[in-house]
Structures are given as structure tokens and as C-alpha cells.
């Protein structure tokens, strides 16, 4: 019963115009290469946490083939929401868990277990601002207060989601945690 994590599959079976190949030839057939490597490593009784950016799809209908691809991977699959997972609305986690019960598990505002650990996670948020940096000199040349305030809101929201999962795990008696961030 091993625990594995990987992220950023960026599948596009129903959205070929968003194929990763647009970023270069190295991405050709990346999904099949990932599948082959996962199948070499992950066994049916292992847990595979997919840490976000599963699909380029904009909605659940478009995402169906991508999720079927993930379902077919070995192991117990736990999916964390990434910044490109537009098919997964923040208030849909429970609905997704019902729809894919026994096949996929969606991790947001909740927890799953691995041995005596609670698995919790959030997509987190990373931002480059609010400072403007001159790349030639590495000196700060400006500041965007609105960008800073928006970033603080996003970081706070994701932190609350993470804490909700930790609190649920604590209430269930867990004292050890593995935290995943996209």
C-alpha cells in the first residue's frame, strides 16, 4: 500500500485545441507516457493523489473522457483541484464525490485516509506580484496594491479550505496529516 502523488496531467481528450503539444513536441502523447509510467509503478492497492490540473475542459461534460482516463489508472485515485480545473466548481466537490463514488475521490474541504494519516489539500495560490521587478536589474520598480489585495483574498480562501479539511480530520480523531498543494 504505497502512496504516490503527481500533478498536471492537463488532459484534453475532448478539447484537442488545448493539447499540451501546443507547448512543444516534447508534449506529444504525454498522457500515454504518464499512463505507462503510472502503470509500471502504481499497484491496485496503492493510493495515487493527483495534485491538480487534470483537464483543460471547461465543464464536466467536456471533462468526461479525461476523468475516464484517470479512472482507468491503477490504484485508489484522489484528485485535488488545480488552478486549471475549470470543470470543477468550488461548490461541487460533494456532487463529484457522489457521481464518481467508488471510482474517484475529490479532495477539497474534506480529507481521506492513508494508513493512520489524514490526507488533506488545497489548490493553494501562488502569485508573482504585487511587486513589479525589472528582470535586467532585479530591482523593484513598482507596486500594485489591488493585485496584492486580490492575492491575499485568494490565499486566505485556499487556507480556509485547507483548515476545513484538517478540522474534519481532527474531529475524526486523526493527529497525523499529509498535506497536498497544487
Where are these regions (language model features)?
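Structural motif
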Residues: 3, 47, 117-118, 176-178
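A generic "structured core" feature
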Residues: 3-5, 9, 41, 179
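A short, structured loop/turn motif at beta-sheet edges
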Residues: 1, 114-116, 171-173
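Active-site-proximal loop/helix segment associated with metal-binding centers of metalloenzymes
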Residues: 11-27, 120-177
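Short beta-strand segments
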Residues: 51, 180-182
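Core catalytic region of metal-dependent phosphoesterases/phosphodiesterases
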Residues: 2, 15-114
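Histidine-centered divalent metal-coordination motifs
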Residues: 8-12, 83-84, 182
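Preference for well-ordered, secondary-structure-rich cores of eukaryotic proteins
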Residues: 102, 107, 115, 126, ...
Amino acid at each position: 500500500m504505497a502512496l504516490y502523488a503527481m500533478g498536471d496531467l492537463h488532459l484534453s481528450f475532448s478539447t484537442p485545441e488545448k493539447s499540451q503539444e501546443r507547448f512543444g513536441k516534447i508534449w506529444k502523447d504525454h498522457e500515454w507516457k504518464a499512463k505507462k509510467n503510472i502503470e509500471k509503478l502504481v499497484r491496485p492497492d496503492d493510493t495515487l493523489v493527483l495534485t491538480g490540473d487534470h483537464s483543460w475542459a471547461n465543464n464536466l461534460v467536456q471533462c468526461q473522457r479525461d476523468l475516464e482516463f484517470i479512472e482507468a489508472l491503477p490504484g485508489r485515485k484522489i484528485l485535488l483541484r488545480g488552478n486549471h480545473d475549470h470543470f470543477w466548481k468550488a461548490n461541487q466537490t460533494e456532487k463529484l464525490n457522489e457521481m464518481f463514488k467508488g471510482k474517484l475521490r475529490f479532495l477539497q474541504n474534506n480529507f481521506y485516509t492513508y494508513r493512520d494519516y489524514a490526507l488533506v489539500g488545497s489548490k493553494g495560490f501562488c502569485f508573482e506580484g504585487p511587486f513589479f521587478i525589472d528582470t535586467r536589474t532585479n530591482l523593484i520598480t513598482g507596486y500594485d496594491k489591488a493585485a496584492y489585495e486580490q492575492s491575499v483574498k485568494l490565499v486566505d480562501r485556499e487556507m480556509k479550505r485547507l483548515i476545513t479539511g484538517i478540522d474534519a480530520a481532527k474531529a475524526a480523531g486523526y493527529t497525523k496529516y499529509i498535506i497536498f498543494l497544487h
